Each structure stands twice: as C-alpha cells, then as structure tokens.
Amino acid sequence: MNEKNIKHSQNFITSKHNIDKIMTNIRLNEHDNIFEIGSGKGHFTLELVQRCNFVTAIEIDHKLCKTTENKLVDHDNFQVLNKDILQFKFPKNQSYKIFGNIPYNISTDIIRKIVFDSIADEIYLIVEYGFAKRLLNTKRSLALFLMAEVDISILSMVPREYFHPKPKVNSSLIRLNRKKSRISHKDKQKYNYFVMKWVNKEYKKIFTKNQFNNSLKHAGIDDLNNISFEQFLSLFNSYKLFNK
C-alpha cells in the first residue's frame, strides 16, 4: 500500500470530548509502552503520552509526522517514525501494547500484521463496525485464524459523526487480548488447511460422512451456521484424530 492511497483513506477524530470517551475504554497506565498505528494529527498521541511511559507512533505521511511532533512539543516520552506499518518490524524482547485508528481499506492487512508479527499483549483498534463483527464470525477464515491467538472483544461503538471527513458507516473500538496459542506449532499448517476447507464448506475433503456426523455430535453442534470457537476447535481436534 503506497502513501497516497493510505492518506486518502484516513478519517480523523479530533474532538477532545470524543477522544476522552474512547480513551475511557482503554486500559493504560504509566508503565505501559505503546505503539500507535497512524498518529494522524497527533490528537490520540497526545492522550497516550500523558497516560503512558513511552509512545512510538508509526505514521506513513511525512507531513502528519511533523504535525504530530509539533503537537507534542512539550513532551519527551515519544518518537514518531515515518514508516509503513505493514513493513515495520516490531520488537521481540519487550512488553508493549498497540493502539490505532486504522484505515478501513487495509484493516485486514494491519490486523494480520500486528497479531502474527508482534508480541503485543493488548491491542486496541478503531475499525469499521462491519469489520469488527466479521472478526467474531466463525464462518470467516480471518476470525478463525485470529481467535487461535487472541480473545476479541467489541468495547464500544464509535459513531461516524466523530470523524472527519465523515465516513458512510459507524466504527467500533475493539480489544485483542493475547493468549497462549490454541494451536501448537506443529499443527499450524494442518489448522490452516482445515480452516480453509471448512469456510469453503468442502467438508468431504476433511471428513467422511460418519466422521463428520460423529465430530458434530462430539462438539455439540446442531447448527453449522452458529458454532462457537470452542466447538470449532473440537472439530479440528477430531480431524487430527482421524488423520494421525
């Protein structure tokens, strides 16, 4: 994604009142180190530096980097990096959290990047509401990949009126909490295969008819359109047993 396309997709929240309402749902303290995805004009960055130990803002737009630095001139616990988040290398040897009001058009790429390429223990993102709902939909491959690594929660609605320019849809503040991976390293490839066959409804490629019926019964599934992640893991574990 080049700089021009990302700039044209940005929607800013600048009202102190609205920012404060969002920040009340984010667990931060003076010991936290934060990576901010897209500092924009620095309005959220300012709130973060006042609450946290250190903030690293990653912003692809050079002009917005300067705007953010000027807004934070009275603070020294931050740095603004003029980089593309999709190319950024997160540290592997320190504790940190991530916050971002991320562009709608690259939300999937960003969320994959930060879940699979960072070690952040808590991630807070403002995303399009429909996208947030898809992250909780076990009929979606992205949701099934993410749920193996993080617990996903929708914390609050963020009305479209908060933004400028005003988008056509509302947004949500979501939280991703890191957990011990539910899939062992040796099973990752097998899990990826199972997920893709499942979401494409290619059941015959992963189960015989009897295996499928027994697996559904063992998982307590009555409706294929309404299964929990735990039930999905039960299906995957059955698949592994049948394919030792």
Swiss-Prot record:
Gene: ermC'
GO CC list: cytosol
Entry keyword annotation includes RNA-binding: yes
Organism: Bacillus subtilis
Binding-site residues for S-adenosyl-L-methionine, renumbered to this chain: N11, I13, G38, E59, D84, N101
UniProtKB keywords: Antibiotic resistance, Methyltransferase, Plasmid, RNA-binding, S-adenosyl-L-methionine, Transferase
Catalyses which reaction(s): adenosine(2085) in 23S rRNA + 2 S-adenosyl-L-methionine = N(6)-dimethyladenosine(2085) in 23S rRNA + 2 S-adenosyl-L-homocysteine + 2 H(+)
UniProt xrefs under SMART domains: rADc (SM00650)
PANTHER family recorded: DIMETHYLADENOSINE TRANSFERASE, DIMETHYLADENOSINE TRANSFERASE-RELATED
MF-aspect GO terms: 23S rRNA (adenine(2085)-N(6))-dimethyltransferase activity; RNA binding; rRNA (adenine-N6,N6-)-dimethyltransferase activity
Phenotype for K133A: Reduces activity by about 80%
Family indicated by similarity: Belongs to the class I-like SAM-binding methyltransferase superfamily. rRNA adenine N(6)-methyltransferase family.
Identification of the protein by name: rRNA adenine N-6-methyltransferase
UniProt-listed GO biological process terms: response to antibiotic
Gene3D superfamilies from the UniProt entry: Ribosomal RNA adenine dimethylase-like, domain 2, Vaccinia Virus protein VP39
Outcome (variant: R134A): Decreases affinity for S-adenosyl-L-methionine 7-fold. Decreases affinity for RNA about 4-fold. Reduces activity by over 99%. May severely impair protein folding
CDD domains referenced in this protein's UniProt entry, alphabetically: AdoMet_MTases
Function as written in the Swiss-Prot or TrEMBL entry: This protein produces a dimethylation of the adenine residue at position 2085 in 23S rRNA, resulting in reduced affinity between ribosomes and macrolide-lincosamide-streptogramin B antibiotics.
EC number: 2.1.1.184
Impact noted for substituting N11A: Reduces activity about 3-fold
